[in-house]
Regions:
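Sec-dependent bacterial lipoprotein signal peptides
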Residues: 1-20
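Lipid interaction determinants
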Residues: 20-184
């Protein structure tokens, strides 16, 4: 009986020591992971539009391969920006209403990428968060982009996407509404 107690005590001590070592190593890896803090506070879910998407539902396959299903209120035409096409990269903001998961903002990132132009600015949104300016004389060209909590951030300028279609883009911030057309 005494031998059994000693064995159990040794096993418990081994598990405690092993558990502490694992906790320290994973904490150090998290501190060195630049992606872990890059979008801290961002509630956006990123992924690809799945084949199960329909007029009132969105199937999103996130970057880890998990499948999410969202209901879409089609009475509000501003919920989905850029359309939903199977395989397109999407950014989704969600909320839970009466137990159902609703997509409150859907941005088609594939549609957003490309060359855009207005009278004042001409730029190209590229994959990987890069923006290339097409006008040499711009005083403050945009060089980076990201979606953060359903808003488009170009350098330090934050915009609401009022409308995104295949040929047009309307952005709004505190300075006003800016319209762009797609260049081919």
């Amino acid at each position: 009986m005494k031998h059994l107690r000693v064995c159990v005590a040794l096993m418990m001590a081994t598990f405690v020591i092993w558990g502490c070592k694992e906790g320290n190593s994973s904490q150090q890896a998290g501190e060195n992971d630049s992606l872990a803090t890059a979008n801290a506070g961002d509630s956006t879910i990123y992924g690809k539009c799945g084949e199960g998407s329909m007029m009132h539902t969105l199937e999103l396959i996130d970057d880890e391969g998990k499948v999410h299903h969202f209901m879409i209120n089609m009475d509000d035409s501003s919920v989905v920006q850029g359309g939903m096409l199977t395989g397109d990269r999407m950014a989704v903001i969600r909320s839970v209403v009466y137990g159902d998961t609703m997509a409150t903002t859907v941005i088609n990132l594939t549609t957003l990428q490309g060359k855009w132009s207005s009278l004042a600015k001409s730029f190209q949104i590229e994959e990987g968060g890069k923006v290339k300016s097409n006008a040499d004389a711009e005083s403050n060209p945009w060089t980076t982009w990201k979606i953060y909590n359903g808003k488009l951030v170009l350098n330090t300028d934050t915009f609401t996407i009022n409308e995104l279609r295949a040929d047009s883009l309307f952005l709004e911030n505190k300075e006003g509404i800016f319209g762009f057309q797609r260049l081919k």
